[in-house]
Amino acid sequence: VVRQNTGLDFQTAVNNELQGGKSLVYKSYGDYCKEGQHSPNWYFASEDVLKLYMDPRNSLHENAIFQFEQLTYNESYHTEAAVETFLKNTFMNSNSPAPKTDMTFSHIFWAIGAEQQVSPFHLAARVYQEQGQGTSPLISGNYPGYEGYYNYFNISASGSTNEQVITNGLNYARNNGWDNAYASILGGANVISANYIKKGQDTLYLQKFNVSTTASNPVYTHQYMQNIAAPTSEALSMKKLYESAGALENTFVFKIPVYENMPASPCPMPTSSTNVVLQVPAGYDASTIYVDGIPYTPQVRNNRRIVTVPNGNAQAAVVYRYNENGAPIGMYVWT
């Protein structure tokens, strides 16, 4: 185990990760974990649920610790047969060639991992995390206007609508000539290794939460994914991979981030929230929000105003519009 002293205050790190749409949760999470909708399936994460995932102490167990594994190649157990074993229960399990190649997926991941000096298990787990059952238009090869192009790692596949996500990702694939599975996986692996692993973001945790002050990119920037649960879910996939390959008894290096001013005990999963989340219309004064008649100065996150009230039973919130003399000339009410 390697101790990574970030030198960062924990609350400051959380506050920065709450901004700019950096941290999202899936729609299945409870409302107390959400602070407004980002896109059809994703919501801005609440402060408390973000703390749960950012607190390394919550992940120091077998099913989650692999988010701290250093992701470099190890020829002693990163074998093609081990990769094939991992892929057995995924959409990449076939002995048939991968799309528009003469190679199996297991050979592709193994060969690229050795070439890039990156764990092929990590590459396979990342694609599995991104693609699930393998039905995404990003890897179908037949999306209208982008026939014959593939983006297995979802590189640059972002946007506020599903169509934007798909077209942005496939534009990137087309611009980079990813016209077969090997080219797409090699290209994506290059992005991950050159832009992340070889630049100091060499764990799953650091690729989501860049809190490394020695990495090439400034802290809180250059983050691979928005899903705050991704490092934990990918870590479980990695653990299962090592287990299936009989590699759990191998030597691993885990790099654990350490923050300043951590809470005395691990941050728990929230079960409720007393936050009121509002989008204030243009022209209204958002500096003070009245909730049940009491004035609050809100926090600002992701173009929303967040007010923490004493309990979860708020009945109404009000903001005012003022003229040039400071006299109220209108109000907007939420109930």
Predicted regions and their residues:
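Short, functionally critical alpha-helical segments immediately adjacent to catalytic or ligand/cofactor-binding
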Residues: 107-135
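Short proline/glycine-enriched turn/loop motifs at strand-loop junctions of beta-rich domains
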Residues: 280-286, 313-314
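Short strand-edge motifs at loop-to-beta-strand transitions and within beta-strands
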Residues: 303-307
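Edge beta-strands of extracellular beta-sandwich domains
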Residues: 324-335
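Short, aromatic- and glycine-rich surface loops/edge beta-strands on solvent-exposed regions
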Residues: 314-323
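Cell-wall glycan-active module
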Residues: 1-116, 197-275, 315, 332
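Catalytic and binding regions of secreted/periplasmic enzymes and modules that target cell-wall glycans
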Residues: 125, 129, 136-257
